[in-house]
């Protein structure tokens, strides 16, 4: 933040000096003013550190950040900002302007640059020359068509979007996949048959790739021209052609020069590592291959968000993103396929009632009976709902005569009066909890998927009567708590009335399909997967994951680095880990 402010102030200082003198800024004056500005900045920083002013500034940072953002965005540099650059007189020399502007073409920030660097360090200089050469020629040809306004080529090519982008992804995929299986041996000859493919692929990708940095830096130029594509307009056609050809020649010469510079720099870095470290050549080659492979793959995927695929598919049909005509279709973020139909005979309506609120168009932290928006602290749905349904996760030890179970029940707020599980008095006894306990006592260890229809036919009438009596007692004796009732009525038991047999059946069905078993009587156990049953299959799956470079890299970054940075006092002992596991099961 302070760096942006210093740069803006420095530009204003140079602009003020230029306006005051009325003449082009001389080189000596530029250096003296720059040194004076740097000394003033250093003096200000030292005074702030010694006077402890930085403590006050840090405390006021939440207030200052919006004001700083507004000042940076709101204050545009004056017109004289572009005048002092004319001291170099680059605007009159298109060759030098093109040469310097080509530095942005050679920045190694695109997928093709990473692939070419990989070929340089693994397969040698000839392979890198052909790779970089095809990319540079493709860029220069594209820029020439833009500068000269060759509409017969540019307009039809751009109207093919996104087909040309998809073609670029296909070409990049072929190159990246081939990198995975290519030999890392150095190619010393200049007439290898692979070089032709290297050149052609890079030439085509220069017209298709969207991951290069120069598209997004087109307004950065060392000359007075507003963009890198700004031409040199003259009334004389011959002079105009000469200037444009000179500018393109400067682009070509600069691209080759800066590319050779980057190649020389990477080769020097490789030589330095070989001489001054204990790494062998094959280790460096393997590391470079992995880094370039991941970088090229990352940049290729990074271009995907620039295209909305739902719009690409329905755009030609006349639709727009977030169109109401696309609601409840596969093109909406809230689309969900219908659930299984095995239990649909119990209900007239679908049993899966899921509320999906996509983050781009949902309303959050509200519920139907209130209009004002509540804070996150007031609506902790997950924790509150887990506390409401905690009775379903009790094990037999909690409800039996075991000493540990009684202590745990007392700590959680349950006071056991009798030996029966159904006679527990809950801290907040509600209609839903009573009904769940009633079902729990009847269907403890039965698989509801096979027997729920027969059970409902025989027990529904008595259950409805008992629940109605319990409901009247609940409404008459207990206080109303909207915070907890919100979960019964809005999330889990919405529009449920115990006076209607049809809705009672819906209630039982919706309650029973929430888990694999109806109200399990033990702690949540770790599910057995295929790898635990068949050890050979599990070992093979683990080996496949461990062979994946992306998986191992993410695992190292996410877990190993995090644990390595933790202080020793933050590590858990054996007793603490055991206690944490018990609390998680609760």
From Swiss-Prot:
Keywords: Membrane, Plastid, Transmembrane, Transmembrane helix
Transmembrane segments: 95-115, 129-151, 155-177, 198-217, 247-267, 284-304
Taxonomic lineage: Eukaryota, Viridiplantae, Chlorophyta, core chlorophytes, Trebouxiophyceae
Membrane topology of this protein: Multi-pass membrane protein
Localization per record: Plastid membrane
Stated family: Belongs to the ycf78 family.
Name of this chain's protein: Uncharacterized membrane protein ycf78
One GO location term (cellular component): plastid membrane
Main subcellular location of this protein, as a coarse class: plastid
Gene expressing this chain: ycf78
């Amino acid at each position: 933040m302070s760096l942006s402010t210093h740069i803006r102030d420095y530009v204003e200082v140079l602009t003020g000096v230029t306006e005051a003198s009325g003449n082009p800024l001389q080189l000596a004056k530029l250096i003296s003013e720059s040194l004076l500005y740097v000394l003033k900045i250093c003096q200000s920083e030292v005074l702030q550190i010694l006077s402890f002013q930085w403590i006050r500034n840090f405390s006021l940072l939440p207030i200052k950040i919006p004001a700083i953002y507004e000042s940076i965005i709101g204050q545009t540099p004056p017109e004289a900002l572009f005048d002092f650059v004319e001291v170099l007189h680059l605007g009159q020399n298109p060759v030098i302007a093109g040469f310097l502007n080509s530095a942005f073409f050679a920045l190694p920030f695109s997928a093709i640059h990473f692939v070419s660097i990989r070929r340089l360090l693994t397969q040698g200089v000839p392979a890198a020359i052909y790779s970089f050469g095809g990319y540079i020629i493709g860029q220069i040809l594209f820029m020439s068509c833009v500068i000269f306004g060759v509409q017969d080529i540019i307009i039809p090519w751009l109207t093919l979007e996104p087909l040309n982008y998809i073609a670029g992804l296909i070409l990049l995929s072929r190159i990246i996949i081939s990198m995975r299986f290519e030999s890392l041996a150095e190619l010393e000859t200049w007439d290898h048959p692979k070089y032709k493919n290297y050149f052609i692929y890079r030439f085509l990708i220069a017209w298709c790739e969207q991951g290069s940095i120069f598209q997004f830096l087109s307004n950065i130029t060392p000359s007075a021209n507003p963009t890198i594509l700004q031409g040199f307009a003259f009334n004389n056609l011959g002079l105009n052609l000469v200037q444009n050809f000179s500018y393109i020649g400067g682009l070509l010469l600069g691209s080759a020069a800066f590319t050779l510079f980057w190649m020389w720099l990477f080769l020097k870095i490789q030589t330095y590592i070989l001489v001054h470290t204990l790494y062998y050549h094959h280790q460096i080659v393997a590391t470079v291959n992995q880094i370039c492979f991941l970088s090229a793959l990352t940049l290729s995927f990074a271009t995907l968000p620039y295209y909305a695929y739902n719009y690409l598919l329905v755009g030609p049909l006349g639709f727009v993103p977030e169109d109401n005509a696309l609601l409840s279709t596969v093109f909406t973020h809230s689309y969900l396929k219908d659930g299984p139909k095995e239990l649909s005979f119990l209900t007239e309506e679908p049993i899966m009632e899921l509320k999906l609120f996509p983050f781009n168009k949902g309303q959050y932290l509200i519920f139907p009976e209130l209009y004002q928006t509540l804070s996150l602290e007031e609506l902790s749905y997950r924790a509150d709902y887990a506390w409401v349904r905690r009775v379903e996760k009790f094990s037999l030890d909690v409800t039996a005569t075991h000493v540990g179970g009684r202590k745990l029940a007392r700590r959680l707020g349950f006071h056991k009066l009798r030996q029966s599980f159904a006679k527990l008095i809950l801290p907040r006894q509600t209609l839903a909890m009573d009904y769940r306990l009633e079902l729990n006592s009847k269907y403890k260890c039965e698989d509801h998927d096979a027997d729920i229809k027969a059970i409902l036919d025989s027990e529904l009438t008595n259950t409805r009567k008992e629940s109605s009596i319990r409901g009247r007692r609940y409404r008459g004796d207990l206080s109303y708590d909207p915070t907890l009732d919100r979960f019964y009525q809005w999330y889990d038991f919405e529009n449920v009335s115990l006076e209607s047999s049809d809705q009672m059946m819906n209630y039982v069905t919706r309650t029973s399909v929430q888990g694999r078993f109806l109200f399990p009587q033990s702690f949540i156990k770790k599910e057995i997967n295929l790898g635990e049953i068949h050890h050979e299959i599990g070992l093979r799956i683990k080996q496949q994951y461990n062979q994946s470079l992306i998986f191992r890299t993410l695992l190292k970054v996410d877990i190993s680095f995090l644990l390595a940075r933790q202080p020793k006092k933050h590590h858990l002992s054996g007793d603490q880990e055991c206690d944490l596991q018990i609390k998680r099961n609760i």
